[in-house]
Design a protein with these regions (language model features):
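Asparagine-centered strand-capping/turn motif at beta-strand->loop junctions
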Residues: 177-181
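C-terminal beta-strand-rich structural cap/linker in extracellular carbohydrate-active enzymes
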Residues: 214-235
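Surface beta-strand/loop "capping" patches
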Residues: 150-172
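Solvent-exposed beta-strand/loop surfaces of large extracellular or lumenal domains
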Residues: 202-219
Length: 235
């Protein structure tokens, strides 16, 4: 089944939307709540902990579909928020579902189901879009890195509105740092728990974003600007 419960719904809510189910209920539609990182963490881990490893790895992860408005069509969702959502979609345990056209920044509207079923814009220079670069980079890593095929998953930070977790094997360590915070934060990620092999903090993340980070006492000390998300390979 489609994994809305621990993927699509919490990701969308964490980055600024109302919960999908609440938005469809008149009695709950106007209840405003900004999801915290702790709530997101509990939602994801409580679900994954109930699943055998083999089942966990094949969860049908998604946040857009033919029945849900496309996240990037919502004018309230910033480019930074969308980037964080896509990073999380690709790096949480499970199989990533890319809904057609998201990588092409397809048009649409959020007021009806028909609004998320627009035709593919084949006449558009899709490979020149920022979303194409985002999706293609993550897809290549997702399908070639052992950490995402058979590796572990561990939450490293879930305070305020920053959620950070690791995907890892004995030889690889990837960090997803996702922020919906309105403030700049300093976080500490205990990367020494993965072994002494991982102590070199890179200057940039996978997408070339400059990192203000250092390694101290077994931890990566990372400055996270408001609303920014990073995908980091530690070596």
């Amino acid at each position: 089944p489609m994994n809305y419960f621990s993927c699509g719904r919490p990701i969308r809510q964490f980055f600024g939307e109302e919960d999908i189910f609440n938005s469809r209920c008149p009695e709950l539609r106007n209840l405003k709540y900004k999801m915290t990182a702790k709530d997101l963490s509990n939602r994801v881990t409580s679900f994954l902990m109930k699943l055998p490893f083999a089942i966990r790895q094949v969860q049908f992860n998604l946040f857009d579909s033919h029945d849900v408005p496309r996240l990037h069509n919502n004018p309230a969702i910033t480019k930074d928020a969308y980037k964080g959502a896509v990073i999380m979609l690709f790096t949480l345990p499970g199989c990533t579902n890319m809904y057609y056209g998201d990588e092409a920044e397809i048009d649409g509207r959020i007021t009806s189901n028909e609004g998320c079923r627009y035709p593919m814009p084949w006449d558009k220079n899709i490979e020149e879009t920022s979303s194409w670069n985002l999706y293609s980079t993550l897809a290549k890593i997702k399908t070639t890195s052992p950490a995402f095929k058979d590796g572990g998953f561990k939450v490293l930070w879930d305070k305020d509105y920053i959620f950070a977790f690791a995907r890892f094997t004995q030889d690889e360590l990837w960090l997803s740092v996702c922020s919906s915070d309105s403030e700049n934060r300093t976080i500490e990620l205990p990367i020494d728990i993965f072994g002494n092999n991982f102590s070199c903090v890179p200057e940039c993340d996978v997408f070339g974003e400059k990192l203000n980070a250092k390694y101290k006492d077994g931890k990566m000390i990372l400055e996270v600007p408001a609303g920014k998300s990073f995908f980091i390979k530690v070596e």
